[in-house]
Amino acid sequence: SMMGVFSGMEIAVWDILGKALNQPVYNLIGGQFHDRLRTYTYLYPKNSGDEGNLKNKGDDVYHDGDAAAERALDYIEMGFTAVKQDPTGPYSFQGGRELSLHELARSEYSVKRIREAVGDRADILFGTHGQMTTSSAIRLAKRLEPYDPLWFEEPCPPDQIQAIGKVASATTIPVAAGERLTTKQEFHECLKAGISILQPDIGRSGGIWETKKIFVLSELFNAQVAPHIYCGPIAHAAAAHVAFSSPSFLILETIQTEFHDNLLTRSLTWDHGYMLAPTEPGLGIELNVETILNHPYSSGGRLHLEMCNTPLDSNNQKKITEL
């Protein structure tokens, strides 16, 4: 929580500094390296709310591989060249569990169907949110290897860096991690463990300057960085500026909802799967104060990565709504 507060304040200072100097932030941290940024999206149901929640019994892209494949094609039509899915849920607070054969088969089938649908037009990113033991993660990775995912994300709990490193050494799929980590020191441990794709969330990792250091550190290990985004348009813009200035950038997560759009009166430009470099000073965005005031903070809604309180046994076949 403290790093989240610090990161937000630090990002605000960079926005102020850029506007004072009439320069986009990326010019203040090394200059522009990329002309545009490749982006990816999660597979969200067609009939979903702003948080990605399933509504009105729409297609369940999280557990139905056929629905996931169909939705992946929709995103390709939008211009995306990479899609992410996490079919290993539901999530439990306990973490580090052994997936059942049913869950292993469901995950493999989903990736298989997506690959059959998209062919070589899009990369598949496989998320797990740290839900597996080391052995279970390796078992799943072996089943996914034939479908050539771009990465296998956070296969073990984030505080088990050495365990994630063991998974990385046991599979041909690049292993990614870092959305819940802070500061360059923790990411250095990831790199030493053999994790080849770092995923700092700039709203948690320490802000713009600390995240820039994480990018630079990745170059020493011949690794790449794919910023994690789930904090809204300010974090999205801040991460984009660091990425535009960094050679080791791989791909940027993006979330496109009507609510996110309404939070801004000026936003960054997204064009057919790519984020274009802003030319306006600071972060290049302006907040819609009226919209923000009309949506005060509330702790009553669904949180990203909300865990169920029911421990899951090794033969779990239930969905989160059934627990």
Residue ranges and their predicted role:
Residues 82, 151, 197:
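Short, Asp-centered acidic motifs that coordinate Mg2+ and/or phosphate
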Residues 142, 148, 156-282, 286:
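Shared catalytic-loop signature of beta/alpha-barrel
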Residues 1-125, 131, 135-138, 142-146, ...:
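N-terminal capping/lid subdomain adjacent to the active-site entrance of alpha/beta enzymes
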Residues 35, 47, 132, 155-158, ...:
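Residue-level signal for alpha-helical context at structural boundaries
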Residues 40-42, 84-86, 125-129, 153-155, ...:
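A cross-family glycoside hydrolase active-site/sugar-binding cleft signature
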